[in-house]
């Protein structure tokens, strides 16, 4: 048992393990919790406990994910681990478990494998900002030169996907050996390597900006007219803070408009300010009810712009998940549900990709019929006749 209760005053960071199947992601997750539990900073979670991940539904997509939590001297971490490759793909694309950074696990005995590459690419596409590497199974490699060769390969692979390969911290060790030591009740030479890894994670992955510190953005859910007071726009504040007197822009669907906030209320009570996570009504000066509609966003002026054409990384639901039963081709025209509204758009598949089958993940180019407030990392659902057939994230804005 942990000796003390979790201390919530430490900065909180979300991380996860990524990498090829059987390279030791789950063993490492168990080893981290085991080694830190000896320091009273975590509760020991067994491998089986993590590997039998409960299935969760995120926008109708079934994802198996394990969540563990632990602390280092400096931080509190929430850590996600997925049992299967498909679960990782779905997790990263839907943002079910947002990651501020990732630990890439590569077997020193095998070197980078296809899913190593795919997880690095996905991290780049979906905006996982920082990666630290653990070269696992070091106990199976007698040749120091081989270890250095694998390290070089990993650095080159990271650089190929625009991560700073040369500056990425890489720690070698053995998750299994560290776990065995910790179960015997001590932090030995292998446990020290896990602590070294966590020290690198502490130092290299920055503490994320809190949602309230970001620029203000609120998707519009509904619009009302209040006699004598003007137009009220309601929604849940996605990020930032809004207060009376703030200038805001209304972006999306039509030409961008500027206005001033004259009131912020929650449950009919006046608030000094609304902040990320609050469901509020925002009163706008001189704005007519018919000028605002669901699907637009209120935001800090200049912080987000409307776009029609973008590239996205998508996961297409399988038939079992309630998705399509048949593939789709270029020029497929579904609805793209962004934040609070559906907008029709047409899909262009990459060169050399004839069609996309249910259960696949692919990069697509989308052209919407009307502009929507978009930025890198904006999540969307793909819908057809009201049912979700895919999920995606904006990876590049074209126009």
Curated annotation (Swiss-Prot):
GO cellular component: cytosol
Annotated stretches, region: G3: 81-84
PANTHER family: ELONGATION FACTOR TU, MITOCHONDRIAL (PTHR43721:SF22), ELONGATION FACTOR TU-RELATED (PTHR43721)
Keyword Glycoprotein: no
Entry keyword Protein biosynthesis: yes
Keywords assigned: Cytoplasm, Elongation factor, GTP-binding, Hydrolase, Magnesium, Metal-binding, Nucleotide-binding, Protein biosynthesis
InterPro entries: EF-Tu_GTP-bd, EF-Tu_GTPase, EFTu-like_2, EFTU_2, G_TR_CS, P-loop_NTPase, Small_GTP-bd, T_Tr_GTP-bd_dom
Subunit: Monomer.
Location of the region described as G2 in the Swiss-Prot/TrEMBL record: 60-64
Protein name in UniProt: Elongation factor Tu
Limits of the tr-type G domain: 10-209
């Amino acid at each position: 048992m942990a000796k003390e209760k979790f201390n919530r005053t430490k900065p909180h960071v979300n991380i996860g393990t990524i990498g090829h199947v059987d390279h030791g992601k789950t063993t490492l997750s168990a080893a981290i919790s085991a080694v830190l539990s000896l320091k009273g900073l975590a509760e020991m979670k067994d491998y089986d406990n993590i590997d039998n991940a409960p299935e969760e539904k995120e926008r109708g997509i079934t994802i198996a994910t394990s969540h563990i939590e632990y602390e280092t001297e400096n931080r509190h971490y929430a850590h996600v681990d997925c049992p299967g490759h498909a679960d990782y793909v779905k997790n990263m694309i839907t943002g079910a478990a947002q990651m501020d950074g990732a630990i890439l696990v590569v077997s020193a005995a095998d070197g980078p494998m296809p899913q190593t590459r795919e997880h690095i690419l996905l991290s780049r596409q979906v905006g996982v900002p920082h990666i630290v590497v653990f070269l696992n199974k070091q106990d199976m490699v007698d040749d120091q030169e081989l270890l250095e060769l694998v390290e070089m390969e990993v650095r080159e692979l990271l650089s190929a996907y625009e991560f700073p390969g040369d500056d990425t911290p890489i720690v070698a060790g053995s998750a299994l050996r560290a776990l065995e030591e910790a179960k015997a009740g001590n932090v030995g030479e292998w446990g020290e390597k896990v602590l070294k890894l966590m020290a690198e994670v502490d130092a290299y992955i920055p503490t994320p900006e809190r949602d309230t510190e970001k620029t203000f953005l609120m998707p519009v859910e509904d619009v009302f007219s209040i006699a004598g007071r003007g137009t009220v726009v309601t929604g849940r504040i996605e990020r930032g803070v809004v207060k009376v007197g703030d200038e805001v822009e209304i972006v999306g669907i039509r030409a961008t408009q500027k206005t001033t906030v004259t009131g912020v209320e929650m449950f009919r009570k006046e608030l000094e300010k609304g902040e990320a996570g609050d469901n509020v009504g925002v009163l706008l000066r001189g704005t007519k009810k018919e000028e605002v509609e669901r699907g637009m966003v209120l935001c800090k002026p200049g912080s987000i712009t409307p776009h029609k054409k973008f590239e996205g990384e998508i996961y297409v639901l399988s038939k079992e998940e309630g998705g399509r039963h048949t593939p789709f081709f270029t020029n497929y025209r579904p609805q793209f549900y962004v934040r609070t509204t559906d907008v029709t758009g047409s899909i262009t598949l990459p060169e050399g990709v004839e069609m996309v089958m249910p259960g696949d993940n692919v990069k697509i180019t989308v052209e919407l019929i009307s502009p929507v407030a978009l930025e890198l990392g904006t999540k969307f659902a793909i819908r057809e006749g009201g049912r979700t057939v895919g999920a995606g994230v904006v990876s590049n804005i074209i126009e």
